[in-house]
Regions:
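Juxtamembrane "helix-exit" motif on the non-cytosolic side of transmembrane helices
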Residues: 81-84, 144-154, 206-214
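Internal transmembrane alpha-helix with an interfacial aromatic "cap," most often the third helix
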Residues: 45-49, 74-91, 96-130, 236
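Membrane-proximal helix-loop-helix units in multi-pass membrane proteins
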Residues: 104-174
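Membrane-interface helix-boundary motifs at transmembrane edges
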Residues: 50-59, 118-129, 181-191, 245
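Hydrophobic transmembrane alpha-helical segments in integral membrane proteins
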Residues: 23-41
Length: 248
């Protein structure tokens, strides 16, 4: 019936095993893309730190980009090595360790983004928001440290994948609302799409958490998710260039 057909599509049971040529092409495309991504965000981050001057907002944004790129490199570099050599199943430990580290650095990324919001819109109080951000980040990191995640194996439990991402998604939702409201209230054209980049990143990430283990093709959604983060970083970089141009 229709429900059984949908189940087969989601789980990938109707898919033929990938041919060697397809696997090689996937390895090349992913590796080239990952190198481009890491070089881009790290370069932009370093340039923002160096070019920010006394502007704390853009220095934080640059640090945020460096944390993003450095953290993701722990996962993407071993992934590229695995795809180009013996395959993902033989790199369980370095890949798992990389995901573990990335789960923490991504949390730090959103905490830094919260402080970018405070600096950009000159928020002086709102201690309740700060407490909420730190609480969600702390819960997320504690959950990521639990041995039940089985990071260093090929099969991490789905239940724990969902559990550790609940506070992460709530943190992301909070940041989305803050940037959406503030950009609209302040008619901030430079940051008017910041909220959308975060929506897109989570929109592509959630299906990967839920279904990538049963259908590896869903893992390809990490590419548009990564593009959304590049957009986030470029919004900050372009805003810095525009403001520096006005001041010169």
């Amino acid at each position: 019936d229709r429900s059984e057909e949908i189940r087969r599509i989601v789980t990938g049971k109707d898919l033929k095993p990938p041919q060697p040529e397809q696997e090689l092409m996937r390895a090349i495309v992913e590796t080239v893309f990952d190198i481009f991504y890491l070089v881009t965000v790290l370069t932009v981050g370093i340039r923002m730190i160096r070019g920010s001057g006394d502007n704390t907002q853009f220095r934080l944004f640059g640090l945020m980009a460096v944390v993003l790129g450095a953290g993701d490199s722990f996962h993407l570099v071993p992934r590229a090595l695995a795809l180009c050599t013996t395959g993902l199943e033989h790199y369980a430990v370095p890949l798992g360790l990389g995901k573990w580290i990335t789960s923490v650095t991504m949390t730090v990324f959103y905490v830094l983004l919260y402080y970018v919001w405070r600096k950009r819109y000159q928020i002086e109080d709102r201690k309740d928001l700060t407490a909420a951000v730190y609480a969600l980040a702390a819960v997320r990191i504690v959950l990521c440290m639990m041995p039940q995640n089985q990071w260093l194996t090929n099969h991490t439990p789905l239940a724990w994948g969902i559990l550790r991402n609940v506070p992460f998604a709530l943190l992301g939702l909070l940041i989305i609302v803050l940037f959406y409201r503030s950009a609209k209230e302040n008619n901030d054209r430079a940051f008017r799409w910041m909220w959308l980049t975060i929506v897109l990143s989570f929109g592509f990430y959630i299906p990967v958490v839920l279904w990538a283990d049963v259908n590896p093709l869903i893992g390809m959604l990490m590419i548009p998710k990564t593009c959304a983060y590049v957009w986030t970083v470029l919004i900050g970089y372009n805003a810095m260039k525009a403001e520096n141009g006005k001041n010169n």
